From Swiss-Prot:
Organism expressing this protein natively: Rattus norvegicus (Rat)
Pfam family, one: AAA
A Gene Ontology cellular-component term: nucleus
Known partners and oligomeric status: Component of the 19S proteasome regulatory particle complex. The 26S proteasome consists of a 20S core particle (CP) and two 19S regulatory subunits (RP). The regulatory particle is made of a lid composed of 9 subunits, a base containing 6 ATPases including PSMC4 and few additional components. Interacts with NR1I3. Interacts with PAAF1. Interacts with TRIM5. Interacts with ZFAND1.
Keyword Disulfide bond part of the UniProt annotation: no
This protein's name: 26S proteasome regulatory subunit 6B
Family: Belongs to the AAA ATPase family.
Region forming the signal peptide: none
Protein keywords: Acetylation, ATP-binding, Cytoplasm, Nucleotide-binding, Nucleus, Phosphoprotein, Proteasome
Residues bearing the modification N6-acetyllysine: K397, K401
Annotated binding of ATP, by residue: G206, P207, P208, G209, C210, G211, K212, T213
GO biological process assignments: blastocyst development; proteasome-mediated ubiquitin-dependent protein catabolic process
Residues where N-acetylmethionine is found: M1
Modified residues (Phosphothreonine): T25
Length: 418
C-alpha cells in the first residue's frame, strides 16, 4: 500500500469508531406475570358459573312455559264448556270493579254477577247485550251491537220497487217530501249557504189509503241512503225497558250507517197524548215516547239522519212530538179531488188492457169520496172479473161492476178520520 502511496493506518485512525445498538422493541419473552394468570382464571370460572346458572334458568322457564300452556288450554276448554250450554241474553248496566258488574235480565230483574276473566273490558259498555251463564248468571260473553235486535236495515236488493212515476197525482206531497228528506242528504251545502237548518223530521198524515206508505216506499227506492222501516207497534214489547232500548237501537243503527232515513209507520201506536197512566203498560208506552223525543233532540245536524213518520190519527199525537225542531214539516194527504182521481186512474190503468168503450172520465166525475187505495181496488177488481170470464180485455161492464162492489163496501164515510 505504501508503494502506491496509500497510507492505511492514517485512514483507519481518521475513521471514527461506530457503535451498533439494538433497537428497543418493547417485547418481553418472559410471558405474563403470575398475578395476571390468577385474575384471568378467576374471571373464566365466574363466567362459567354464570353460564351454568343461565342454563338452569332456561330449563326452568321452558318447564314453566309448558305448564302455562297446559293451564291456558285447560282454561280455554273450560270457557268453551261454559259457553257450550244455553246462555241467557241480558243487558250490561254498570261495572262495579274489574271482576264484577250489574246486569239486567229479560225478566226485568237486575243481578250482581262476576265477569269472565277472558272478556275484553273495553267492550263492556252500558246497554250492551251480554250472554249470562244459565245457572250462576255470570257474564261469559259480549254480543255484537246488532245481536238481540229486531231492527233491520233494508239492503239494496230489499228496497221496494215503487217509483215516483208509479204514484198518480200527489205532486205537492212528492215535492215536499223530496225537499225535506232527499235534498238535505244529497245537497246539504245548499242549506248551509242559505243559512238555515234542514228539516229534521217529516210527518205524513191523512185518511187511510191516500199514499203515505207508498210515497215512503218510493223514497226508499230512489235514495242511496240506508233505509230503516219500523212500525210503531213493534216498540211495544212484553218486558219493561225493551221498547226504549229498541228506539235507541234504531237511531244507533241509523247513525252508524249515515246517511240514513228512518221511517216509522203508524206512529200513533206510541206517540199519543200523555195522561196520568194508571197501568204499567201505559207507563211503558209513555217511556217509549220520552225516549223517542230524547233521541230526536239529540240529533246532530252534521249527521245525515232523517225521520219520516206516518199516521192517520194526527189529532191524537202528543204536542211535544209535533213541535218545530222535531217534526219540522207536516204533510197532509187528503182524499183525492177530481184532478187527482184522473191522474190516479190514468197511472193505474196505463198497464191494463182496456176496451175502447171504457170511459174513465165517467168514474172521475162521480161525487163519491174515494181514496187512492179504493181506485186501485176498483181497477184490480175489474181485471179479476175479466179473468173470471177468460177475457184478455177489460170491458166497461167490468169497471161498472167493480166500482159498485168497492163503493158498496165503503158506503159509510170514515167519520173516524175526519
Amino acid at each position: 500500500m505504501e508503494e502506491i502511496g496509500i497510507l492505511v493506518e492514517k485512514i483507519q485512525d481518521e475513521i471514527p469508531a461506530l457503535s451498533v445498538s439494538r433497537p428497543q422493541t418493547g417485547l418481553s419473552f418472559l410471558g405474563p406475570e403470575p398475578e395476571d394468570l390468577e385474575d384471568l382464571y378467576s374471571r373464566y370460572k365466574k363466567l362459567q358459573q354464570e353460564l351454568e346458572f343461565l342454563e338452569v334458568q332456561e330449563e326452568y322457564i321452558k318447564d314453566e312455559q309448558k305448564n302455562l300452556k297446559k293451564e291456558f288450554l285447560h282454561a280455554q276448554e273450560e270457557v268453551k264448556r261454559i259457553q257450550s250450554i244455553p246462555l241467557v241474553i241480558g243487558q250490561f248496566l254498570e261495572a262495579v270493579d274489574q271482576n264484577t258488574a250489574i246486569v239486567g235480565s229479560t225478566t226485568g230483574s237486575n243481578y250482581y254477577v262476576r265477569i269472565l276473566s277472558t272478556i275484553d273490558r273495553e267492550l263492556l259498555k252500558p246497554n250492551a247485550s251480554v250472554a249470562l251463564h244459565k245457572h250462576s248468571n255470570a257474564l261469559v260473553d259480549v254480543l255484537p251491537p246488532e245481536a238481540d235486535s229486531s231492527i233491520m236495515m233494508l239492503t239494496s236488493d230489499q228496497k221496494p220497487d215503487v217509483m215516483y212515476a208509479d204514484i198518480g197525482g200527489m205532486d205537492i206531497q212528492k215535492q215536499e217530501v223530496r225537499e225535506a228528506v232527499e235534498l238535505p242528504l244529497t245537497h246539504f251545502e245548499l242549506y248551509k249557504q242559505i243559512g238555515i237548518d234542514p228539516p229534521r223530521g217529516v210527518l205524513m198524515y191523512g185518511p187511510p189509503g191516500c199514499g203515505k206508505t207508498m210515497l215512503a216506499k218510493a223514497v226508499a227506492h230512489h235514495t242511496t241512503a240506508a233505509f230503516i222501516r219500523v212500525v210503531g207497534s213493534e216498540f211495544v214489547q212484553k218486558y219493561l225497558g225493551e221498547g226504549p232500548r229498541m228506539v235507541r237501537d234504531v237511531f244507533r243503527l241509523a247513525k252508524e250507517n249515515a246517511p240514513a232515513i228512518i221511517f216509522i209507520d203508524e206512529i200513533d201506536a206510541i206517540a199519543t197524548k200523555r195522561f196520568d197512566a194508571q197501568t204499567g203498560a201505559d207507563r211503558e208506552v209513555q217511556r217509549i215516547l220520552l225516549e223517542l223525543l230524547n233521541q230526536m233532540d239529540g240529533f246532530d245536524q252534521n249527521v245525515n239522519v232523517k225521520v219520516i213518520m206516518a199516521t192517520n190519527r194526527a189529532d191524537t199525537l202528543d204536542p211535544a212530538l209535533l213541535r218545530p225542531g222535531r217534526l219540522d214539516r207536516k204533510i197532509e194527504f187528503p182524499l183525492p179531488d177530481r184532478r187527482q182521481k184522473r191522474l190516479i186512474f190514468s197511472t193505474i190503468t196505463s198497464k191494463m188492457n182496456l176496451s175502447e168503450e171504457v170511459d174513465l172520465e165517467d168514474y172521475v166525475a162521480r161525487p163519491d169520496k174515494i181514496s187512492g187505495a179504493d181506485i186501485n181496488s176498483i181497477c184490480q177488481e175489474s181485471g179479476m172479473l175479466a179473468v173470471r170470464e177468460n177475457r184478455y180485455i177489460v170491458l166497461a161492464k167490468d169497471f161498472e161492476k167493480a166500482y159498485k162492489t168497492v163503493i158498496k163496501k165503503d158506503e159509510q164515510e170514515h167519520e173516524f178520520y175526519k
